[in-house]
UniProtKB/Swiss-Prot annotation:
The keyword Membrane applies. It comes from Capreolus capreolus (European roe deer). Keywords: Cell membrane, G-protein coupled receptor, Glycoprotein, Lipoprotein, Membrane, Palmitate, Receptor, Transducer, Transmembrane, Transmembrane helix. It comes from the Eukaryota. This is Melanocyte-stimulating hormone receptor. Residues 1-37, 94-118, 184-191, 267-279 are extracellular. Glycans are attached at residue 29. Residues 64-72, 141-163, 212-240, 301-317 are cytoplasmic. Gene3D superfamilies: Rhodopsin 7-helix transmembrane proteins. The gene is MC1R. GO terms for cellular component: plasma membrane. SMART domains: 7TM_GPCR_Srsx.
Length: 317
């Protein structure tokens, strides 16, 4: 993974140093003022990864169990859960191997650890790209269902959805291979950052347009019922709150990581950028948090899926 400063790499575990005692430390910069560095304990990484792992496994199991959920929209949600699942698995695996190496319970040559590190980095990169793609696919699917409701089932068909899903996974695998092979090339980093900005812009435009259409529809109903102001204001506030949460979580969880990549290109030697580089572990933790929040936003709000989830949990007991 192309990072500067503090980073979670397996090779660093071969010559490990004791972890910081406090979660917040002021890290001195050689050419500038002190920096605030947030140290993320390995136990927290494991806990976040395991919570995300359980959540997303439940989403996949619920969608697989209920045939009523075998539709393009839920297939996109299922693939998002698989992507988040891979993010969690890769980080849990990396943390576990690092802990075993540091404790001396696992002996491995540097070359073997390097290969394992590359595999995990490919898994992380591919799952990140696929997660962003499926977030965009879900936004497009919802947009079509609102603005082209009568034509939705002819536009978003199962064969077309499967082709989109296959294309996303193939593109994610190819992207991860290119990223690991050419991570030290500026163009590769800029393409990843540009991809994130494009997904953010796509989601913002589509969801804002959907909110505007929903408010317009609510105003029409209010005029018929002669209660325009209360209904419109209440619906508008609820829709704006939902939109803020959806886009806010996306930006807060993914933004710092891609800011990190941008600064590697723009100011790799600047003291202020160096302060940001030191918090790379925090940025990874935020991405895992996004994998925890995604099921709450996209999956568990469905009554049908929640009902199926209860059945899955009852069967497991």
């Amino acid at each position: 993974m192309p990072v500067l400063g503090s980073q979670r790499r397996l090779l660093g575990s071969l010559n490990c140093t004791p972890p910081a005692t406090f979660p917040l430390t002021l890290a001195p910069n050689r050419t500038g003022p002190q920096c605030l560095e947030v140290s993320i304990p390995d136990g927290l990484f494991l806990s976040l990864g395991l919570v995300s792992l359980v959540e997303n496994v439940l989403v996949v199991a619920a969608i697989a169990k209920n045939r009523n959920l075998h539709s393009p929209m839920y297939y996109f949600i299922c693939c998002l859960a698989v992507s988040d699942l891979l993010v969690s698995v890769s980080n849990v695996l990396e943390t576990a191997v690092m802990l075993l190496l540091e404790a001396g319970a696992l002996a491995a040559r540097a070359a073997v650890v390097q290969q394992l590190d590359n595999v995990i980095d490919m898994l992380i990169c591919g799952s990140m790209v696929s997660s962003l793609c499926f977030l965009g696919a879900i936004a497009v699917d919802r947009y079509i269902s609102i603005f082209y409701a009568l034509r939705y089932h002819s536009v978003v068909t199962l064969p077309r959805a499967w082709r989109i899903i296959a294309a996303i996974w193939v593109a994610s695998i190819l992207t991860s291979l290119l990223f690991i092979t050419y991570y030290n090339h500026t163009v590769v980093l800029l393409c990843l950052v540009g991809f994130f900005i494009a997904m953010l812009a796509l989601m913002a435009v589509l969801y804002v347009h959907m909110l505007a259409r929903a408010c317009q529809h609510a105003r029409g109903i209010a005029r018929l019922q002669k209660r325009q102001r209360p209904i419109h204001q209440g619906f508008g506030l609820k829709g704006a709150a939902t939109l803020t949460i959806l886009l806010g979580v996306f930006f807060l969880c993914w933004g710092p990581f891609f800011l990190h990549l941008s600064l590697i290109v723009l100011c790799p030697q600047h003291p202020t950028c160096g302060c940001i580089f030191k918090n790379f572990n925090l940025f990874l933790a935020l991405i895992i948090c996004n994998a925890i929040v995604d099921p709450l936003i996209y999956a568990f709000r469905s009554q049908e899926l929640r009902k199926t989830l209860q059945e899955v949990l009852q069967c497991s007991w």
